[in-house]
Amino acid sequence: MATVRAKFWVTGIRHLHQPSPDQVFAEITLAPVYAGQDGKPANADWSKATPSGEIKMGVTNPAAIEKFTLGQKFYIDFTPAED
């Protein structure tokens, strides 16, 4: 199986009000990084030019929400999944 690796960064964390105080919901938004620290394209595996895209996740686990901070970078591996 071939894997495509993408480097994304957190561009938004939006906390939404929930009717119950013990419920949480945050919308986490990520976008592709344009260049690596060495100035070379960070996402050359999948984009020959300026990479574009967006990942949005609705997260309801407080421990998971705490793992994301604005500006933080992540590698995201796309590996085919079986049914």
Cite the ranges covered by each PLM segment.
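Short, basic/aromatic beta-hairpin or loop at an interaction surface
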Residues: 42-55
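Short proline/glycine-enriched turn/loop segments at secondary-structure junctions
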Residues: 18-19, 45-47, 64
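A broad, low-specificity signal marking well-ordered, structured residues that form hydrophobic/aromatic
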Residues: 8, 28, 55
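Basic, polyanion-binding surface patches
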Residues: 37-38
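Short, compact, well-ordered microdomains
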Residues: 54-83
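Structural detector for short beta-strands of small beta-barrel domains
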Residues: 3-16
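Short aromatic-glycine-enriched beta-strand elements
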Residues: 22-31
